[in-house]
């Protein structure tokens, strides 16, 4: 049925691995539809893009300080992101309901958290389900920056400016998680690993421009981001 629906869209939408759909699942779908991208697991590419975004946050927002980070979700994206950050000596807290995934995180050197509102982390990196950024989060959060790979993090778009009015810098998910699409399309665009990594690194450059705007105006209208980057 899923393949039938994708075929009905006739190429307007291309499906790929994501939450609830494994790479093996999508390869089965590819037997019934050509409108899929099943060449790679996008998770590591998404994670590398987030890493470049976070590195830009550390360099340009925190002036090089290696701030603590809370990663929510320790699947393909969260675990790969943690590996990059741990290599730099970053202290990482992990919010994960799956006990096996949490144990994996702890073995790597991450720290558990009982509540996302009770850690020393300055940066919140949501890499699980969407809708996590709601009024309760804004009210209780002490984070300075939100920068993660989960899709549709805002419960509603009108919370975008509200987050910034509370002094938090939110880097939009559709910019931060672009690495997944970059990885999925590398074969279609005939990019080698070096070209792909350069494309991923550009995510960090985009994040720098957002940080510059935030420092200048202490807010970032959603329209500014969409008009400039979409």
Tell me what each language-model feature is.
Residues 144-228:
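Adenosine-phosphate binding glycine-rich loop
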Residues 3, 7, 27, 47-55, ...:
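Predominant activation on well-ordered alpha-helical scaffold segments within soluble catalytic domains
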Residues 1-63:
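Glycine/serine-rich phosphate-binding loop and adjoining beta1-alpha1 elements at the start
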Residues 41-121, 125:
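Glycine-rich phosphate/diphosphate-binding loop of Rossmann-like nucleotide-binding domains
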Residues 12-17, 63-68, 214-226:
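Flexible, glycine/charged-enriched surface loops at secondary-structure junctions
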